[in-house]
Swiss-Prot record:
Subcellular location: Cytoplasm; Nucleus
Source organism per UniProt: Mus musculus (Mouse)
Predominant location category: cytoplasm
Role noted for this protein: Pre-60S-associated cytoplasmic factor involved in the cytoplasmic maturation of the 60S subunit.
UniProt lineage: Eukaryota, Metazoa, Chordata, Craniata, Vertebrata
Residues with Phosphoserine modification: 275
Protein's name in the database: Cytoplasmic 60S subunit biogenesis factor ZNF622
Subunit: Homo- and heterodimer. Associates with pre-60S ribosomal particles. Interacts with MELK and MYBL2. Interacts with DNAJC21.
Length: 476
């Protein structure tokens, strides 16, 4: 019987060197742990099998770290599959997945509504196919944040991913859509002014010059006409009638992908869902033209309705719509000279004191230019064309001549669409800019003035008492 043994591992050795080397091995340490746990020792072959199995598990974990898992619904990247499984069971992922399903369902319903308008019924549609389409739309939905997007190492993969998301490639040297749209509007305005100037010049020439007209044959007249000019005019007219590429139709929402069956329903949707309102709607004369212009501004120019040229540039309609929804910019900017942008769609003649209902605008302009100022000899007051009264300075020593501005504001006859929208605004509690709103504004101005005076008074009073570190610069 050998004298050198290991009781823990139940093995014998020929010499002391092998015994000391055995005590330093992992096999002996493993059996020591098993002995402490009151478990039987394992043989050398069994220990090697367990080591190989543990190495396989470690290699699989390393491989899973290299192949990261990505959640499309949440836009998150996970290093291990276990973390990905834990994320799938979280409440946050379930909420985002439900939102994605609802968004995809709304998109499918919108497409179905458009198909119904085109005459394509939904009969015979397979429900399984619809569900598969919804799941495919969820998987194809892009990430909401560029920081959460999966990493793409090569340019080819980047171009493929951009094409899959539907984002067109953009040339860095290309001008932003906003700048291009502003240039187009400037060209249209210059062209319109030039045409108006030509028409005025032709009218003046016809009035000043008396030319002798000669009778010519019909064949000669046809020979003088240039067919190329007529073709060019027809092309220009067709270009003006057709909407620009990318413009939002008047039946689609300016701030989301909602589609309505009519213009009035579209405006009602934008009012209720996005709190969009049209300023001075009682004087609006062309609702369709205004919504069409705003659709071109958002769809073609990619411009925020509130930021205008001051905000950052956008390169897609979805981006500018998301910006307006996130920043609560679903409103028109009409402060100062910005209101002149929408002047063509309004008619404020009904607010003029000398306006008569049913009067021709041309006659009104002629009367306004030839109008004579009225003067009252008894009160020595001068009545201006705007209705304002001006007193004489010789009477200033007796009393202060302060005349109000009487304005009889009447609501002009407008289109049926504008009337319906106005009724919707009033049903939502809109009161306009008169009455209690003006009184409240004046009260707030008075409160602000009193607060400013009080703050100035307190500041002046504490200016002399709160100088804790003041030191006189005389008599050192």
């Amino acid at each position: 019987m050998a004298a050198l043994t290991c009781i823990t591992c139940r093995v014998a050795f020929r010499d002391a060197e092998l015994q000391r080397a055995h005590y330093k091995t992992d096999w002996h340490r493993y059996n020591l742990r098993r002995k402490v746990a009151a478990m039987a020792p394992v043989t050398a072959e069994g220990f090697q099998e367990r080591v190989r199995a543990q190495r396989a598990v470690a290699e699989a974990a390393e491989a899973s770290k290299g192949a990261a898992t990505y959640c499309t619904a949440c836009g998150k990247k996970f290093a291990t599959f276990n973390a990905y499984e834990n994320h799938l069971g979280s409440r946050r992922h379930a909420e985002l997945e439900r939102k994605a399903v609802r968004a995809a369902s709304r998109r499918v319903e919108l497409l179905n509504a458009k198909n119904l308008e085109k005459g394509l019924g939904a009969d015979g549609v397979d429900k399984d196919a619809v569900n598969a389409a919804i799941q495919q739309a969820i998987k194809a939905q892009p990430s909401t944040s560029p920081k959460k997007a999966p990493f793409v190492p090569t340019d080819e993969c980047g171009r493929a991913a951009a094409g899959a998301r539907g984002v067109p490639e953009r040339d860095p040297t290309e001008k932003p859509p906003r700048l291009q749209w502003f240039e187009q509007q400037a060209k249209k305005l210059a062209k319109q002014q030039w045409e108006d100037g030509e028409e005025e010049g032709e009218e003046e020439e016809e009035d000043d010059e008396d030319e002798d007209w000669e009778d010519i044959d019909s064949d000669d007249g046809l020979e003088c006409e240039d067919p190329g000019v007529e073709d060019q005019d027809a092309e220009d007219a067709a270009a003006e009638e057709s909407p620009p590429l990318g413009a939002i139709p008047i039946t689609d929402c300016l701030f989301c992908s909602h589609h309505s069956s009519s213009l009035v329903k579209n405006v009602a949707h934008m009012t209720k869902v996005h709190s969009f309102f049209i300023p001075d709607i009682e004087y609006l004369s062309d609702l369709k033209g205004l919504i069409k212009y705003l659709g071109e501004k958002v769809g073609v120019g990619k411009i925020c309705l509130w930021c205008n040229e001051k905000g950052k540039s956008f390169y897609s309609t979805e981006a500018v719509q998301a910006h307006m929804n996130d920043k609560s910019h679903c409103k028109l900017f009409t402060d100062g000279d910005a209101a002149l942008e929408f002047a063509d769609f309004y008619d404020f003649r009904s607010s003029y004191p000398d306006y008569k209902e049913g009067q021709d605008p041309a006659e009104l302009e002629a009367l306004s230019t030839d109008k004579i100022l009225e003067c009252d000899d008894e009160t020595m007051e001068l009545i201006l064309p705007s209705g304002a009264r001006v007193g004489h300075r010789s009477l200033m020593r007796y009393y202060k001549q302060r005349f109000g501005l009487p304005r009889a504001v009447t609501v002009a006859r407008n289109q049926k669409a504008v009337g319906r929208v106005l009724q919707q605004y009033r049903a939502l509690g809109w009161m306009g800019s008169t009455g209690a709103a003006l009184m409240r504004e004046r009260d707030m101005q008075y409160v602000q003035r009193m607060k400013s005076k009080w703050m100035l008074k307190i500041g002046m009073k504490n200016n002399a008492t709160k100088q804790m570190h003041f030191r006189a610069q005389v008599r050192f």
